[in-house]
Amino acid sequence: MRDVSNETASVSVVGPDAAAALSRLALGLRVGASALSTAGEGGWYGVGAATLDDDGRVERLFVSRTEDVWPDAWTVYGPVDAVRSLWMALIAEGARPAGLGVWGTLRVEAGRPVFGTDMDENTLPPEAGIVDRAVDQTKGCYTGQEVIVRIRDRGHVNRHLRVLELGDVPAPAKGAELLAADGSGKVVGQLTSVVQSPRAKGVLAMGYVRRGVTEALLGDRTVRVPADD
């Protein structure tokens, strides 16, 4: 085993034509676009690349599907030179480079929380809505299992992570508080991520809101809160 971090790069391809573009390129994909499109989250495929190194050896790339953004995306991992060649081929295919800001917008549009921004060590998985993809209900004992099982079988959490459409307004700061709609001043929620969303045609935010709250105040505006699951 050796650390290959400095020798490895990755590129993510996002969009409705992403799978088809990857399949068209000279990567020797073992699966076609339709198989990529139906792959489960985190599913890996080995890809034999057309790129050769100085020794004439075929480089190997790996592609994994992610549902962390909208639309779905695929991330390709491999040697730096091979990934650089893939990047150039994607540009030639008409792909447009985008940075972390765009990725963040697509993530919020997908309603996917990220650790360190929307979650921390004090967040319960049911609060963040990640139980289905982050908790194994059949696994043996693990730290926090009793709490998870108790919530699942006999209770509920008092807050939920929600995606909130704020409209065509100046973007509020991360951490901005949501207050009760009755004007009492009671804090009923807090924003964790805020982005400008072309899809929503305005500001889109993620934040935790107390269970049962359907409307809240953000400054002098009323924000509609999606219903509890």
Task: Give the ranges of each region predicted by the language model.
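Short, charged, solvent-exposed linker or helix-capping segments at domain edges/interfaces
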Residues: L22-A26, W87-M88, M119, G175, ...
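Glycine-rich, small/acidic residue-mixed loop/short-helix segments
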Residues: T123-L124, A128-D229
